[in-house]
Swiss-Prot record:
This is Uncharacterized protein L780. It holds the Pfam family RmlD_sub_bind. GO terms for cellular component: methionine adenosyltransferase complex. One of its GO terms (biological process) is S-adenosylmethionine biosynthetic process. It comes from Acanthamoeba polyphaga mimivirus (APMV). It comes from the Viruses. One of its GO terms (molecular function) is methionine adenosyltransferase regulator activity.
Length: 289
């Protein structure tokens, strides 16, 4: 099977490409920019892929490792181009050629109560975005809504706070380990080592529609750091700060929410819950002593 990957050189795209190649699949890295519809259509016509996957998007840039990059003056065009127009071009063109598209979107488009608990249902795939605290989330929220028009053609996966066993500046665990102060709030999160194989299986099976693509349940920053301290780094310390203190040092607010994973679990009941998954990840991580 031939897979055309947009964003194959990025963090997640390169991980997916590597796993596909290990599975014996033919992987082609897209040369066209997703926002150049003519070039995309030419490339798809020439490559004739069986599947297309999109890992494009703008979450950081020079001088910024977070979405605060998009709060700078003059970044609106880049935000809309990379986080809305490009993905929509791919959806329209793949629909035209009857090719299954997997789009890696985000669940950072909702805001729950700060004190929500694991016994709450969380936001479902049909809920409309209610978080507009950052330029990133505003644009991605409307992209998510538009992807619902492609329910029969596109697999729209909402990930959150992605985590990997291997430390990487993009991984949520690596990020919070670099912070001296933490605003610890329970959240839905996605463990990529456990979820990428599920993503590939869904694409291979031509599953379509929107899915909350997180490990079931909630985990807080403090719970993750406590596990790292207990297993690897007994001298690890950190300071907590309030949501108000966090807002004072950020250019934009951050989404905190619980995503309902019933739909995903109906197809993949063995996806590990987030607490079990985090314990497995932390136990396998390597740290310099």
């Amino acid at each position: 099977m031939k897979w055309l990957i947009f964003g194959n050189k990025g963090w997640i795209g390169s991980m997916v490409s590597k796993i596909l190649e290990q599975q014996g699949e033919q992987v082609v890295g897209a040369q066209s920019r997703a926002d150049d519809e003519s070039a995309v259509e030419r490339e798809i016509s020439e490559i004739k892929p069986d599947r297309v996957m999109s890992f494009i998007g703008r979450t950081h840039g020079p001088g910024y490792s977070t979405i605060d990059y998009l709060e700078q003056s003059g970044k609106l065009v880049e935000n809309v181009k990379d986080n809305l127009y490009g993905p929509l071009c791919l959806a329209f063109i793949c629909q035209k050629y009857n090719i299954h598209l997997t789009y890696l979107g985000t669940g950072c488009i909702f805001e729950g109560q700060n004190n929500f608990s694991a016994d709450e249902k969380g936001f479902t795939e049909n809920d409309k975005p209610n978080f507009f605290g950052s330029s990133y989330s505003v644009v991605k929220g409307f992209t998510d809504r538009l992807m619902h028009f492609f329910d029969n053609d596109v697999l729209n996966l909402r990930i959150r706070m992605p985590i990997t066993i291997e430390q990487n500046p993009r991984s949520f665990i690596t990020k919070i380990l670099s912070y001296s102060r933490i605003c610890s709030i329970p959240n839905s999160m996605t463990i990529l080592d456990q979820m990428i194989p599920v993503m590939i299986d869904m694409a291979r099976n031509k599953t379509t529609g929107t899915f909350n693509f997180t490990n079931p349940g909630l985990v807080s920053h403090n719970e993750i750091l406590s596990l790292i301290r207990d297993i690897h780094k007994p001298n690890l310390t950190w300071e907590n700060m309030s949501r108000e203190q966090q807002l004072a040092i950020l250019k934009a607010d951050r989404s905190n929410n619980l995503l309902n994973t019933d739909k995903l679990q109906s197809l993949y009941p063995d996806v590990p819950d987030i607490l079990t998954g985090i314990r497995e990840v932390v136990s396998k991580m390597k740290f310099q002593q």
